[in-house]
From Swiss-Prot:
UniProt keyword annotation of Protein transport present: no
Name used for this protein in its record: Protein BREAST CANCER SUSCEPTIBILITY 2 homolog A
Gene disruption: observed consequences: No visible phenotype under normal growth conditions, but the double mutants brca2a and brca2b are sterile due to aberrant chromosome aggregates, chromosomal fragmentation and missegregation during meiosis.
One Pfam family this sequence matches: BRCA2
BRCA2 repeat locations: 63-97, 116-150, 163-197, 257-291
InterPro entries, per database record: BRCA2, BRCA2_hlx, BRCA2_hlx_sf, BRCA2_OB_1, BRCA2_OB_2_dom, BRCA2_repeat, NA-bd_OB-fold
Keyword line: Cell cycle, DNA damage, DNA recombination, DNA repair, DNA-binding, Meiosis, Repeat
Region (Disordered) residue spans: 408-427
Subunit structure: Interacts with RAD51 and DMC1. Interacts with DSS1(I).
KW Transmembrane helix (keyword) present: no
GO molecular function, one term: DNA binding
Tissue: Expressed in flower buds.
CDD domains assigned to the protein according to its UniProt record, in alphabetical order: BRCA2DBD_OB1 (cd04493), BRCA2DBD_OB2 (cd04494)
Organism whose genome encodes this protein: Arabidopsis thaliana
């Protein structure tokens, strides 16, 4: 928007209008003319009149009748009559009398126009036609402008002085000047709760010359922008004009006390009105401890800081005036009870403008001024440092203590939300690190929930907006306080290596070969070769320039000087990281001497590594593997890569032996993740590996499924390494050798499963293994009988045991109830002490022939006593019953049974198709306790599964035995595509006939469908109950070998099973039964009979339609067909007689 400005004509006879983006400045005779950029809006009528008056007063040749103050665009003079001034005076709501108009030679119509309030012809069109201006239009204009007065401030601002100088005390982030008008200043007064004389900080009034004092005018100036301008008045101005100017001068410079409505302007230029009630609510809602004192009411006696609420005056830089400031103070004294607060710009504080301040009355306003002084001092220091200038000012903190004593406040040295000696935050619309770290003050209420950091101001809608990283020079030139991020927060950036701006190069790519200690170490000094992890923290660097020794303590000081917080970078923290950094760099120099040449272990590299670790751990909150485990944020069973840093033999007098479990071996090792370390206990097998030299210092281990002993609460790794009570429990099944270039810490990739033939039976839990399911056995039930005794039953027998157990319990309980009912009369006679009257009534009704008639004649009190006693009696009786039944059942051995279901699965190891060696897979049996329903139904024979949570059982058998819990183990099937990469392992179930039973090796499992020829009686043999069953399948009739057509099956149970339930009922004779999972035993050559054993996993089915025995369905049908033949009956009879002769029975009822 263009700016119009009045300038004197070159001839000096008049004035002219010009459009200028740069407004010239009035200066004294000794000061050259300067040009200032301005973005001031068009001058108001009050500005024009004030400019015209000042110019008229300055000119000596002005005539009383006409005043050539304005000129047209062509340079023609525009006559300004005194009657026009009177009209303008009436427009501005001034009191105009007829005498005034007469003195201005106004005509009668003009007097009428002035006297008339409805039409005031102030303006004219280009053709000379008058434009009437009504008072309603003026009221609308005043409502739009937000003020009912043209000028409403205690003093005239420089922009309104008529000298064409912009009052640009404030600047935006884009270096654009912000003009402050008198109305805006009045709104600021209303917003900040200031009084009438509180705006003298903006006046910068200088004493004028004697000529200006004669007429009561004073020059207006701003600091370092323009000098004082003296306005002279001609003493020979005739008539009432001099009186008018004198009266207007006082009216313009001393406006009324009415404050206009408060308005704000958005970045787009829109004006927003804010009522006093809204401002009051905002002040109560915000409650900002830093700027809240701006909104406090001075008349209420509130102060910025009180000893109860705030004690931090000592951390505010204060300068209570200086003799070299060059500012002139007002000598006026206010008559108010309280000295009002002075709102001061952060650029130029009032203590730098006034040389004399009454400290006794600055209870609240003085503290605010000192805040701004601190901001200005901080800015001056930053500017002087930028230009290389030295600043010899004294520290303002000393003055802060003195002023706090005068004001009666207690200085406070520390504030939780802000560091000491910190200036006020620069409230500009820039997002830099200084504002980003300006967190919420601790005195405010903390708000829960998600926190979003946004800029408090809108971005200016201009194309020249500069990002915070590109406008450091602009901030310095604007004079705003530049606050560095280290003064606002302890999270100062110490290292620029993180986040990495380019991909990191790891040791495998950098060195390219395995670390090997060469015999030639010309580049490695002796003191470097002697560095170990145990003494690396005591290593010191020798400064060649001096005799100083640089060790961990020196690096602690270096970090503190770099801005690190000693709360985080403590002595223990620095010593710990110094130890691992020195050891790592020394190993590089030792094992890669040709490439390193001793340039890795240097002071610069160590310091940079410490800064890098501080940046990641403190500023970014990253934690290493060991720190996360000790803090409880990650389980110790996670897969990670650690390095052996030391081997510590465990003595017999070790006091920490009790803290480790039985798996703790005679040797402990120290493991590190490069940042922290902790002890680890090895199991027996790992100890053997250590003694064999397969574990050594510097070796990396891939650990999975480790345990944690001695840990109860989150612990710091610096404390855990000292206490030695917490240790990792390592086992060989979860510990593998890692590659020399693997990164330390947690592993992101999935762990490789351990092969079944690599599992050690005493090597601890197996984190993960891959195997195929060869057989799934039926559900079994294990009952614990106490005293470490137990018995295993099949599902069929368990159901019978449950039925028999419940029958026995029911019979026993019925007997107890009958006996209890017979002894009921003697029971209640001894328990009538609770209610004598109720007991008597109860006995009476119990023996009465017609108790209903007796109850009808009872009073309500008697009925109530009877009911109460009866309820108590029945409750006690029920309790006695339950107790008596429980005791009787327990004595009879019929208490609650402790039965746990389980299932067994036979596994087989896998062999890759690419393997060229001998194929000898290892087999194992897994016992799943309390299997889930999904495991019972979804596990399938012949599939490959990824299994987790298996624990091996120590056994000398060639078969590996493992166990797992159904809820904690995981069975994930392998995809068919991946299963094709392994050699076949599964032989499907198929029925075996007696004719080819000789092809099966001994101790092998087989399934058969057979005809039951004879069922023997159960007998006891060596603490076992046995029962023999003889079967045939008819295959001998086709082969003609009658001698090999019998199979004797032995069923056995434990002797502790005192149940009378037999495995095979005699009723099964003559039926076709399917037997699964029978074990082949040696053949009875004497009697020419095949022998098999039914173990715990063996099961039989009468119905061939069962899912488990579906593969026997066809053979069962053939046997039934064969048994119905007439020729087969003689064969069956002959076989039965043969069985009786073998067992020694002459005759059997079942024959």
């Amino acid at each position: 928007m263009s700016t119009w400005q009045l300038f004197p004509d070159s001839s000096g006879d008049g004035f002219r209008w010009e459009v200028a983006g740069r407004i010239l400045q009035s200066v004294s005779d000794s000061t050259p003319t300067k040009a200032l950029e301005s973005t001031a809006p068009l001058p108001s009528m009050a500005d024009l009149l004030l400019q015209g008056c000042s110019k008229l007063i300055a000119r000596e040749e002005a005539m009383p009748g006409e005043i050539p103050m304005f000129r047209t665009g062509l340079g023609k003079s525009v006559v300004l009559k005194e009657s026009s001034i009177a009209k303008a005076k009436s427009i501005l709501a001034e009191k105009v009398t007829y005498s005034d108009l007469r003195n201005t030679n106004c005509s009668i119509p003009q007097m009428r126009q002035v006297d008339t309030a409805e039409t005031l012809p102030m303006f004219r069109t280009a053709s000379g036609k008058s434009v009437p201006l009504k008072e309603s239009s003026i009221a609308k204009a005043m409502s739009i402008l937000g003020s009912d007065k043209i000028i409403d401030s205690d003093n005239v601002l420089p922009r309104e002085s008529g000298f064409g100088v912009s009052n640009s005390l404030f600047q935006t982030a884009s270096n654009k000047k912000v003009n402050v008008s008198s109305a805006g200043l009045a709104r600021a007064k209303a917003l900040l709760g200031l009084e009438e004389d509180d705006l003298n900080g903006f006046n910068h009034v200088n004493q004028s010359s004697s000529s200006s004092q004669q007429h009561g005018w004073s020059g207006l100036k701003t600091h370092e922008e323009f000098d004082a301008t003296v306005v002279k008045h001609h003493s020979g101005t005739p008539g009432q004009y001099e009186d008018y100017v004198s009266g207007k001068r006082s009216e313009v410079l001393n406006p009324s006390l009415k404050v206009p409505p408060t308005k704000f302007q958005t970045a787009g230029g829109k004006s927003l009105s804010v009522s006093a009630e809204a401002l009051k609510r905002a002040r109560n809602l915000l409650g900002d401890p830093e700027l809240g004192s701006f909104f406090d009411d001075v008349a209420g006696g509130d102060q910025f800081f009180t000893p109860e609420k705030d004690e931090r005056l000592s951390d505010i830089a204060i300068n209570n005036g200086s003799a070299n400031r060059g500012y002139i103070a007002h000598e006026e004294k206010t008559s108010n009870k309280h000295t009002p607060n002075s709102f001061v710009s952060p650029l130029w504080s009032s203590s730098k403008q006034f040389s004399s301040v009454n400290l006794e009355n600055l209870a609240s306003g003085g503290n605010l001024i000192k805040k701004f002084d601190a901001a200005v001092d901080e800015t001056d220091c930053a500017l002087n440092a930028t230009h290389g200038l030295s600043n010899n000012r004294s520290l303002a903190s000393d003055m802060a203590v003195n002023n706090s004593k005068v004001n009666g406040f207690i200085p406070r040295g520390r504030q939780p939300g802000r560091p000491a000696d910190q200036p006020l935050v620069d409230i500009t619309n820039r997002r830099d690190t200084a504002y980003a770290y300006n967190k919420q003050d601790s005195t405010q209420k903390k708000r829960l929930g998600k926190t979003v950091s946004v800029s408090p101001f809108k971005r200016p809608r201009i194309s020249s907006f500069k990002t915070p990283s590109k406008k450091h020079a602009l901030q310095a030139s604007s004079g705003l306080s530049v606050v560095s991020c280290d003064t606002l927060t302890s999270k100062k950036v110490l290292s620029t290596r993180y986040p990495e701006k380019s991909p990191r190069v790891y040791i495998k790519d950098f060195f390219g070969m395995h670390p090997t200690a060469t015999t030639r170490m010309d580049y490695v000094p002796d003191h470097v070769r002697r560095i170990k992890s145990s003494n690396a923290d005591k290593y010191v660097f020798c400064d060649e320039s001096s005799s100083n020794k640089v060790g961990a303590e020196t690096f602690l000081q270096m970090l503190a000087e770099s801005g690190a917080s000693l709360q985080h970078a403590s002595r223990k923290w620095v010593t710990n990281h110094y130890r691992w950094i020195v050891w790592k760099l020394a190993c590089y120099d030792i094992y890669y001497p040709a490439k390193c040449r001793g340039n890795f272990l240097t002071i610069t590299n160590v310091l940079e590594e410490l800064k890098y670790r501080y940046e990641r751990e403190v500023n970014h909150g990253h934690c290493s593997a060991i720190k996360r485990i000790l803090s409880g944020d990650a389980p110790a069973s996670s897969m990670m890569v650690l390095c052996i840093s030391a081997i510590n033999p465990k003595t017999d007098n070790d006091s920490q032996e009790a803290h480790c479990s039985d798996s703790c071996s005679n040797v402990k090792v120290e493991l590190t993740d490069g940042w922290y370390s902790m002890n680890a206990a090895l199991d027996v097998v790992l100890t053997k590996q250590l003694n064999a030299g397969k574990l050594f210092v510097g070796q990396k281990l891939r650990i999975l499924g480790a345990g944690l002993s001695g840990w109860a609460t989150p612990t710091s790794p610096l404390e855990a390494v000292i206490s030695s009570t917490i240790c990792l429990l390592l086992n060989i099944n979860g510990t593998y050798r890692a590659h020399w270039a693997d990164r330390l810490g947690f592993c992101k990739e999935i762990g490789v499963p351990l092969a079944l033939n690599c599992i050690k039976c005493n090597g601890g839990p197996v984190p993960k293994t891959l195997a195929g399911i060869k057989r799934i056995y039926p559900i079994l039930y294990k009952e614990r009988l106490g005293e470490k005794k137990s018995i295993v039953r099949s599902e069929r027998i368990e159901s019978r045991i449950i039925q028999l157990h419940n029958q026995r319990r029911s019979a026993l309980v019925e007997g107890i109830m009958c006996e209890y009912q017979r002894g009921i009369n003697g029971v209640h006679s001894q328990n009538d002490t609770d209610s004598e009257e109720g007991a008597k009534i109860f006995k009476l009704l119990e023996t009465a022939a017609e108790p209903e008639f007796l109850m009808a004649e009872m009073s309500p009190e008697q009925l109530r006593s009877f009911t109460t006693y009866k309820a108590k009696f029945e409750a006690a009786q029920q309790m006695r019953k339950e107790k008596s039944v429980a005791e009787t059942l327990e004595d009879a051995g019929l208490g609650e049974r402790n039965v746990t279901p389980f299932m067994r699965i036979r596994l087989v190891g896998l062999t890759s198709l690419s393997y060229e060696g001998e194929h000898n897979p290892k087999e194992g049996i897994v016992t799943i306790w309390d299997p889930t329903e999904r495991q019972r139904t979804e596990l399938t024979e012949g599939k490959i599964y990824m299994m987790k949570g298996l624990v091996p059982i120590n056994s000398d058998s060639e078969i590996l035995y493992l166990h797992a819990r159904g809820s904690s183990s995981r069975w994930q099937p392998l995809s068919p595509k991946d299963s094709e990469n392994f050699q076949p392992f599964f032989n499907p179930r198929k029925p075996i006939s007696l004719s080819n039973l000789g092809e099966i090796p001994l101790s092998s499992e087989f399934d058969i469908a057979a005809y039951v020829v004879y069922v023997g009686n159960a007998y006891t043999d060596v603490l076992q109950k046995k029962q023999w069953v003889f079967v045939t399948d008819g295959s001998a009739q086709h082969s003609g070998e009658i001698s090999n057509s019998l199979l004797a099956i032995s069923f056995s149970t434990s002797f502790m099973d005192d149940s009378s339930v037999s495995h095979i009922s005699h009723n099964l004779v003559g039926s076709v039964v399917g037997f699964c999972n029978l074990i082949k035993r040696a053949k009875d050559v004497t009697n020419e009979i095949w022998v098999a054993e039914a173990a715990e996993n063996s099961v039989y089915f009468i119905n061939a339609e069962a899912a488990y025995s579906s593969h026997l369905k066809t053979s069962s049908a053939h046997i039934q067909t064969w048994a119905k033949l007439s020729s087969s009956k003689s064969v069956i009879h002959e076989l039965r007689q043969r069985v009786l002769s073998i067992i020694g029975a002459c005759k059997s009822p079942s024959c």
